[in-house]
């Protein structure tokens, strides 16, 4: 089974990824955890470029796609073949939202490129943790921000709206109210996850 977590920066996604991983550890369920961009030697090098270097929107998208293609071929496909659960802190839907909508490259264009980069390998469940943009920005205000996290409210609103549209169009999306407590969110995720097992 392949599970990804999505949401705008500051939604609490990475916290929930780690809590689900802890749950799998406790239950003795074999898994691997990956992140995007990253998860491979090449992917981590690309991550560093994406976070620190100024670049045009198309270059940004193509770097994310290169990282994703390597991650799918060298980590995700082998793990799924070996019966492990893959837990991804972001995956292809992030590019649709961030580059397709936020950078205005077009969600349909990004979807086509994602199909190529992932060899049409997609999550069985997408936990989309939804929070209003002002809540996410408040959570991020005291953090060191990378190049993308420094974007303004309009950018984040565009991304959130794109995620909500994808959630309506994809039955494997599970919308999680990210304004609740960490524990409440985790309980809901575990309940949904166990129903899929």
From Swiss-Prot:
GO terms for molecular function: ATP binding; dTMP kinase activity. Coiled coil: none annotated. GO terms for cellular component: cytosol. It comes from the Bacteria. It catalyses: dTMP + ATP = dTDP + ADP. GO terms for biological process: dTDP biosynthetic process; dTTP biosynthetic process; dUDP biosynthetic process. Phosphorylation of dTMP to form dTDP in both de novo and salvage pathways of dTTP synthesis. PANTHER family: THYMIDYLATE KINASE (PTHR10344), UMP-CMP KINASE 2, MITOCHONDRIAL (PTHR10344:SF4). This is Thymidylate kinase. It comes from Fervidobacterium nodosum (strain ATCC 35602 / DSM 5306 / Rt17-B1).
């Amino acid at each position: 089974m392949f599970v990804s977590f999505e949401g705008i920066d500051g939604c609490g996604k990475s916290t929930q990824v780690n809590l689900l991983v802890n749950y799998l550890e406790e239950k003795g369920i074999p898994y691997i955890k990956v992140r995007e961009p990253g998860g491979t030697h090449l992917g981590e090098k690309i991550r560093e470029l994406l976070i620190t270097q100024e670049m045009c929107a198309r270059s940004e998208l193509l770097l994310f796609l290169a990282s994703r293609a390597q991650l799918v071929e060298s980590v995700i496909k082998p793990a799924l073949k070996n019966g492990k659960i893959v837990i991804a802190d972001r995956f292809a839907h992030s590019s649709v939202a961030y580059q397709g909508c936020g950078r205005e490259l077009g969600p349909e264009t990004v979807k086509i490129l994602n199909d190529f980069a992932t060899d049409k390998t997609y999550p069985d469940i997408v936990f989309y943790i939804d929070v209003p943009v002002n809540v996410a920005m408040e959570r991020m205000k005291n953090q060191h921000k990378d190049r993308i996290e420094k974007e303004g409210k309009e950018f984040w609103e565009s991304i959130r709206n794109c995620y909500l549209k994808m959630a309506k169009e994809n039955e494997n999306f599970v919308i999680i109210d990210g304004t609740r407590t960490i524990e409440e969110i985790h309980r809901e995720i575990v309940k949904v996850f166990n129903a899929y097992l």
